[in-house]
Amino acid sequence: MLEVKFYDTVDDSLLKFAVIISQSNGKWVFCKHKERDTYEAPGGHREVGEDILETAKRELQEETGAIQFNIKPICVYSVTGKNSVNENGEETFGLLCFAEIREFSGQLDSEMEKVVLMDELPQNWTYPLIQPKLIEKYMQIEKQSYSQIQLSAKQTIEYIKNTIKPGMNLLEIRKLCEEKLLELGADSFWYWDVGAFVFAGDETCVSVSGKQYVTSDRVIGNNEIITIDLSPQVGNIWGDYARTIIVENGMVVEDIGLIENPEWKSGLQMEEKLHAELLRFATKETTFEKLYYHMNEFIVENGFVNLDFMGNLGHSIVKTKGDRVYIEKGNMTKLGDVKYFTFEPHIAFPDSKYGYKKENIYYFIENGLMEL
């Protein structure tokens, strides 16, 4: 029986193999050997004097024909027990990596017959006692990474709530938010290099692409409505989180029920209602289009309008901006076919100068939809 273990690090000299879990355009990348009818993740032996990450790059290129890709180490794995590459059964170590492949050459310089892109993991594995466990570990680490970067966004909103005061301008608020995101682990910002989209007052009705966004120098008053939309990332792992903040009598009002302005209170209550309706309505089989129609009808039935400049209500969380799919008309992708998606209705009362926004990332577990 083979035993697979995982380590953060070991002595470099122990690393004899590299396995590269790979994806391209949201699909798993697997290889089929010329002499087998099974599938495997690319990988292989380290050559003498070779840097282990170079081993991973070389094996990826040889076995998949990848020519444009990003690759990163995930962790160290070990296998104990006799197998085709370990006659003695002692513990052997390898580097587990992840690669996002952007382009293939179409030619393979290896014993592999072909490369296959799959929506689901294969049933017929070449190494059924090893590689499924490696992929399970990768998925566990990836989820932790998404949770951590999203947590940094949530903590940044809590930080700025305790910092905002009358007299501050929006440029200062943006700067503080972006600095806090970086302090909490983000290394960059995925949406047009802007970490915090900040609007106040009648600007909260503005819906604009990040490409055209310019932060105003508007000054916060004693009674103010502010929307902040955060887009941190670490590597190619995204966070996406937005909240509407109310300032009354010079203080941030934490409890929606304590907001004095009736219009602002109703707007934030509607955002809560929308997210509750999402959790009630959405299933893995619900298409993005069906959710689009249902939620837009729900918005109108409750006396509000959708302010989004594209008319959509959210998007999938991916690793490249151009790969996103949206909660929009015509998108027949099922919610359960993506790992994570955002729900971010930007709404207002008709003809009002104030807009409201609340954004979370959601994902499915066996029992239903969960907030990340």
PLM segments and residue spans:
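Acidic, metal-coordinating catalytic segment for phosphate/diphosphate chemistry
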Residues: 1-19
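A generic structural micro-feature
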Residues: 12-14, 87-93, 218-220, 354
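Short glycine-rich loop/turn motifs
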Residues: 17-19, 28, 194-196
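Conserved Nudix-box catalytic region and its N-terminal flanking loop in Nudix hydrolases
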Residues: 23-62
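Short beta-strand scaffold segments in enzyme catalytic cores
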Residues: 18-22, 362-363
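Active-site neighborhoods and metal-handling regions in enzymes and metal-associated proteins
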Residues: 141-372
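Short helix-loop capping/hinge motifs at secondary-structure junctions, enriched
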Residues: 28-29, 103-107, 252-253
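Unchanged
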Residues: 46-70, 77-133
